[in-house]
Amino acid sequence: MIDSRQIFKYRIKLIKQAGALPIHELRVKLQEILLNSKLPFEWTKSGPRLVLGPGEKQTDIQSDCQYVDIYFNRDIREHLIEQELGSLLQAEGYEIIETEQIPYNLCSVESLAKYVCYEASPIALKGDLPKELLMQVNDKVVNLRSFIKGLKALGDNKIEIIIELSALRSIGIEQMLMKLPCLEVKSTGLKLKRKALLWQDSTGAFRQI
């Protein structure tokens, strides 16, 4: 059991420069940078503990921003984090523009996700998806069909379904869709297996958190 009183959480906002390291490689590079730093980061089985979040479009400066939560086992001043990580991240095309210590229990950057991706298998349907994909949420019945942002055939009678979380207008339903590993749609025999949380970059492409 993790004692939250001994863990300190910092949210860093990075600005992406031209020629920057691709976002899908950023997590590994961040862990490598932390390993070579003097910072008291929190360990996990896979290395320094961090969570990479979705990007954000900065329209005034036309540059992508990226959030990351990093966990430390000791309270540390924000400027020391920037001092240790700043130049190394800049070499990879990212500049730190904001560092803030936040409460340990504050929602992770994962909560910045706008979409959730499901794989549907098997498809007990003929032809297109029905107009109603009903899901029971407590005392409510939600039609997921209304919130589908994208569909993609994967072969082997499987499809990929992307659902827009913010369109649901219910924090409870959003949280459930983000956390439940599997959903079963009423009356269709369709089972949805959660694959990933997604965000959409400035080009409109979906990227995994």
Task: Label each PLM-derived region with a short phrase.
Residues 4-7, 19-22, 44-49, 126-209:
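Core RNA-modification/binding signature centered on pseudouridine synthases
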Residues 106-123, 198-209:
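Short, low-order "capping/linker" segments at domain edges
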Residues 1-32:
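Short, extreme N-terminal leader segments that mark the start of a protein/domain
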Residues 41-72:
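Short, charge-patterned binding micro-sites
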Residues 62-114:
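Ordered, amphipathic secondary-structure segments that act as subunit-interaction surfaces
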Residues 28-40, 83-91, 178-185:
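Short, intrinsically disordered, mixed-charge
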Residues 6-16, 68, 110-124:
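Short glycine-/aliphatic-rich beta-strand segments at the starts of folded cytosolic domains
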